[in-house]
From Swiss-Prot:
Name of the protein: UPF0060 membrane protein GDI3492/Gdia_2889
Matching InterPro entries: UPF0060 (IPR003844)
Protein's cellular compartments: Cell inner membrane
Keywords of the record: Cell inner membrane, Cell membrane, Membrane, Transmembrane, Transmembrane helix
Membrane-spanning intervals of the chain: 8-28, 35-55, 64-84, 92-112
Species classification: Bacteria, Pseudomonadati, Pseudomonadota, Alphaproteobacteria, Acetobacterales
Source organism: Gluconacetobacter diazotrophicus (strain ATCC 49037 / DSM 5601 / CCUG 37298 / CIP 103539 / LMG 7603 / PAl5)
Length: 114
């Protein structure tokens, strides 16, 4: 259980870094922000990549797949808290489906190649 909570914390931090880094590019390209926002954005994306290497997993692909569910939750939370947009029923249903998939992948654990 402790390892699962640790992985969740790393995934949540990685999601914040990835979403924040991508949002910097979005702000520069689509919202008219100055190019200076790209510097913290790139640093955030580099930190995102490093964080995923901290997850206790035998395979990168399984790590990235499980992370995807957490990323989607983070993106919807970002939508609400940062962009101020409402979360729709379809958003919530999509999150639930993705979390179920991530839970299945995470429950396999290490060495679950069968």
């Amino acid at each position: 259980m402790r390892m699962l909570l640790g992985s969740f914390a790393v995934y949540a931090a990685a999601a914040l870094c990835e979403i924040g880094g991508c949002y910097a590019w979005w702000c520069w390209r689509r919202a008219g922000a100055g190019a200076w926002v790209l510097l913290p954005g790139m640093a955030s994306l580099a930190l995102f990549g490093w964080l995923l290497t901290l997850v206790d997993s035998d395979t990168a692909g399984r790590t990235f797949a499980a992370y995807g569910g957490i990323y989607i939750v983070g993106a919807i939370v970002w939508l609400r808290l940062v962009e101020g947009r409402p979360v729709t029923l379809r958003d919530a249903a999509g999150v639930a489906i993705c979390l179920a998939g991530a839970a299945i992948i995470l429950s396999a654990g290490r060495g679950a190649e069968r």
